[in-house]
Amino acid sequence: MTQVTSRQRLSPRVRGLLGGVAAIGLLAGAAGPALADETCQSPYMAKITGEEDYVYVWTLGVEGMGDGSDKLVTVDVRKGSPTFGKAIKSVSVGGRHEAHHGGFTDDRRQFWAAGLSDSKIFIFDVASDPAAPKLVKTIDDFVEKSGGAAGPHGAYALPGRMLIPSLSNKSKTGQAALVEYSNDGTYIATHWLPTDKDPKGAKIEKTADGYGYDARILPRKNVMLTSSFTGLENYMRPFGEMAKDAEAMKKFGQTMVLWDFHARQPKQVLHVPGVPLEVRWAWGPHNNYAFTSTALTSKIWLVYEDEGGAWKAKEVADIGEPGKGMIPVDISLSADDKTLFVDTFMDGTTRVYDVSDPHKPKQILEKKIGAQLNMVSQSWDGKRLYYTSSVLSNWDKTGADNEQFLKAYAWDGKELAPRFEIDFSAEKLGRPHMMAFGAAALYTQ
């Protein structure tokens, strides 16, 4: 398959071929080239192998700040541009919906962005003018269509479809599901996570709590891996209030689920205590493993296939000083599978690990980014890193520590060198959360 760079054109015919090849890979479990720009994006998307032109930032609105609405902010990151490092466009969606995660469709023509509080999904056209996305559709019946799933957590590209993990259900507990839509926004199916009462045929290692969070796929092994967080009754509460509620703190995920992806069938429920969040599969053709981090126990975990073909999970490293409650949040694995970036919210720090031996991570750098820290996005070539600050509107810090920023760095394998930063509060934009990359050349005819 010819890889499309940011200097090349992606014609309708080529887009069709890419979609067709991806579909074949989906059905056959074939291993094709890694297809993504940020290394955590879906393998079913064409990747940017040159430099990204724009960073799209899905941003939480703040009452009394600008228009107060959630918005998609476009940041210019083109070298030599007169607006380099500046927010050049923002598209408000009207109101606050707890903007959180999102993702591109497989043809990269749309960006789907989800709201955790009211379960709305906003669909942006990023192809017509990549510098100025347009809101073209809103899905406002997610709970009804899905049969009761709530809290859509981003969107993950499948060939012609979007996979949307939920965090909750209509009763606001942690019972979660995976929901599929077609690229035109038509509901297709709901797949509920296994529980102790309804294991759905899965082998349970210790418990099946039914919580959901992330979902990531390793196509060549026909494996999907999901992680677990908490329900709406917890994630919309003020963090300090919730942390003092002993019963609330029991309502967090302790599991990861391995699925037969083609069949959408849960096969094995792994015990991963401490709230495993982001899932990052290795990219190498023989690297059958994924990393996650646990928010409440500050550990790096490895989910791997052993020599006998069995899937297992084990903790492989501490994050920061044990017992300090760093709260690991986002992670990013480099395209060569050698470097893992781990962000911790409470101390605003990113830690970089050599994971050449995935069973024995070694920390090689620790750098404070800000008073608080959440997301990290990495360019495919591993040379540029972007960081944002907000976790959830009711969980972010207050006062002087409530820094809201996008910060960009260059990475040479040893140090992170600042490139630019944007103060989202000073710009009256809001709380920046999830990032995604764009390149104008993808859509040039």
Can you say where each PLM-predicted feature lies in the sequence?
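Asp-box/WD-like beta-propeller blade repeats and closely related beta-sheet repeat scaffolds
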Residues: 126-219
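Beta-strand-rich domains and repeat architectures in extracellular enzymes and scaffolds
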Residues: 37-78, 83-116
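Beta-propeller domains
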Residues: 105, 205-351
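Beta-rich, blade/repeat-based domains predominating
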Residues: 39-46, 67, 94-106, 144-161, ...
